[in-house]
């Protein structure tokens, strides 16, 4: 079993809480950390934009990443949201196994 991190930015606390609660409740991820007051700079509409955002860091099995990303995309309010993932190479074995157990309910192998 391999595990991954999903990194997501959102515009406000309400949306962060909504996405986090939905994807945990639906067992697409084992847990989500929410970090507030992340300052983002990006190019949009032919200009540099700056916005205070919230960061979600979700943990899941790699096999579930595509389904989790799709679900986050369905809920997310942005036209082009930042939703990216990368594998966890190493970590606390007990924690990584817990991630696997908590996301088995998805039926995705």
Model-inferred region functions:
Residues 1-109:
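Positively charged, small/polar-rich N-terminal and surface patches that mediate targeting and assembly
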């Amino acid at each position: 079993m391999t595990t991954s991190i999903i990194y997501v930015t959102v515009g406000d606390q309400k949306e962060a809480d909504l996405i986090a609660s939905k994807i945990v409740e639906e067992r697409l991820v084992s847990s989500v950390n929410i970090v507030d007051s992340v300052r983002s700079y990006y190019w949009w509409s032919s200009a540099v934009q700056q916005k205070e955002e919230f960061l979600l860091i979700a943990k899941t099995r790699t096999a579930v990443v595509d389904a989790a990303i799709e679900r986050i995309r369905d809920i997310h309010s942005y036209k082009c949201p930042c939703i990216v993932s990368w594998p966890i190479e190493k970590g606390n074995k007990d924690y990584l196994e817990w991630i696997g157990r908590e996301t088995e309910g998805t039926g995705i192998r």
